[in-house]
């Protein structure tokens, strides 16, 4: 943000750390949050996808607790939603996050990698659904300047 003032940058940083703290604090309670605070509009679309076993890609916004929407989709009967993730660089943080996710229902997570893409394609070919966040960065390919 080259045109942002020091005050603006400080506010962005403060808000970012506050949001990250909330996200971390919510992790142990994700299952409760999905059923209480996550409302689905146009649920008939999800019901149709489930009924017809339609492969599709759900695209979400990387805002607040990004796990909630994917978990809510997985609660929809008949859907088989796998999520794309990028493991944190810190291996201990990655292990903690993985332990807080619920794998009891056979939930699928696809690593943001070439192998993960292959797994996603296979999942879609088997009439599954994939959830991805619009800002997930991949370091291969063409580099583009953004936020100029």
Name these PLM-found stretches.
Residues 1-36:
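Negatively charged linear elements and acidic catalytic determinants
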Residues 23, 31-148:
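Soluble catalytic domains of membrane acyltransferases
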